[in-house]
C-alpha cells in the first residue's frame, strides 16, 4: 500500500538496469540522496537531492522529478536558478561562482 500523505524523509536514487529508481536505503558515497517531503513513496513538495560528487538540487518536486522553483548547483559553484519542469531546466538562469550570468533556458531551450 502506498503512502499517500506527505511527510519528511530520506530516499536514495539509483540506476538499476538503465532506469532510475527510488529506494528507502542507499549509500551516500555512490547513490543520490534526497531529503525532504515524500508522498506516494517518491519526492513530492520541497526537498534537496545531493549527488555523491557534491552537485545539489534544492527546490520543488512533483512525482519524483524536479518541478517548480529550484536551484541546481554544480560542484564547481555554477548555479542554475529558476523553474524546472519534469527534471530539466525550463526557465532558468545560469550563474558562475562569481555571480556572472553564463546562460539561460527559456521554455526548456538553451538560449
Regions found by a protein language model. Give the residues of each.
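Glycine/tyrosine- and acidic-biased, solvent-exposed loop/turn segments at the edges of beta-strands
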Residues: 1-111
Amino acid at each position: 500500500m502506498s503512502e499517500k500523505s506527505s511527510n519528511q524523509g530520506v530516499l536514495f536514487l539509483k540506476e538499476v538496469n538503465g532506469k532510475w529508481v527510488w529506494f528507502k536505503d542507499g549509500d551516500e558515497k555512490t547513490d543520490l540522496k534526497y531529503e525532504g517531503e515524500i508522498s506516494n513513496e517518491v519526492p513530492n513538495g520541497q526537498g534537496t537531492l545531493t549527488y555523491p560528487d557534491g552537485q545539489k538540487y534544492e527546490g520543488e518536486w512533483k512525482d519524483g522529478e524536479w518541478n517548480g522553483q529550484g536551484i541546481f548547483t554544480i560542484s564547481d559553484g555554477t548555479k542554475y536558478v529558476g523553474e524546472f519542469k519534469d527534471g530539466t531546466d525550463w526557465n532558468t538562469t545560469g550563474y558562475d561562482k562569481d555571480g556572472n550570468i553564463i546562460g539561460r533556458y527559456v521554455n526548456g531551450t538553451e538560449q
